């Protein structure tokens, strides 16, 4: 009597084939390192009116976060390598973010212990060059 009360033949509980398969997380299915479940939980908790969040939306946001993190870490690693050190510091993060035009517009935050970029205003440089030129002519 499939479909009636009592013992049924079909269903997940009766099949022995699915017992051998290991469970895969959403992150593993999408090939990501960041946790999709945690991102989904944050999205659900931080939205107004307790809006529903789809599974694909959480995977997409997780992929974007992972890509941006990898991009920043790669640039910061290059900055650390240029300075011949093996540890990435907030200064390297600052140099990496401010050195890339797109990341600079995206991340407008102040990075603690990041310092400032070495920059001299062009107007000041022109005055110094003119003074040097006047001294050589005189």
Curated annotation (Swiss-Prot):
Region (Disordered): 1-32
Main location class: nucleus
Entry keyword set: Acetylation, Chromosome, DNA-binding, Nucleosome core, Nucleus
UniProt xrefs under Gene3D superfamilies: Histone, subunit A
Subcellular location: Nucleus; Chromosome
Domain of life assignment: Eukaryota
Pfam families in the record: Histone, Histone_H2A_C
Stated role: Variant histone H2A which can replace H2A in some nucleosomes. Nucleosomes wrap and compact DNA into chromatin, limiting DNA accessibility to the cellular machineries which require DNA as a template. Histones thereby play a central role in transcription regulation, DNA repair, DNA replication and chromosomal stability. DNA accessibility is regulated via a complex set of post-translational modifications of histones, also called histone code, and nucleosome remodeling.
Quaternary data: The nucleosome is a histone octamer containing two molecules each of H2A, H2B, H3 and H4 assembled in one H3-H4 heterotetramer and two H2A-H2B heterodimers. The octamer wraps approximately 147 bp of DNA. H2A or its variant H2A.Z forms a heterodimer with H2B. H2A.Z associates with the vps72/swc2 subunit of the SWR1 chromatin remodeling complex. Also interacts with rbp1/DNA-directed RNA polymerase II largest subunit.
Family membership noted in the UniProt record: Belongs to the histone H2A family.
Protein name as catalogued: Histone H2A.Z
Species assigned in the record: Aspergillus oryzae (strain ATCC 42149 / RIB 40) (Yellow koji mold)
């Amino acid at each position: 009597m499939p479909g009636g009360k009592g013992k049924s033949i079909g269903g997940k509980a009766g099949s022995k084939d699915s017992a051998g398969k290991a469970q895969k997380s959403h992150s593993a299915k999408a090939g990501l390192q960041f946790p999709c479940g945690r991102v989904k939980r944050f999205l659900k908790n931080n939205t107004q009116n307790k809006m529903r969040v789809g599974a694909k939306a959480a995977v997409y946001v997780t992929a974007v976060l992972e890509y941006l993190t990898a991009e920043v870490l790669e640039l910061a690693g290059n900055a650390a390598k240029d300075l011949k050190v093996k540890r990435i510091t907030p200064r390297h993060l600052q140099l990496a973010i401010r050195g890339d035009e797109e990341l600079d517009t995206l991340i407008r935050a102040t990075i603690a212990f990041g310092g400032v970029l070495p920059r001299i205003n062009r107007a000041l440089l022109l005055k110094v060059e003119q003074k040097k030129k006047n001294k050589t002519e005189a």
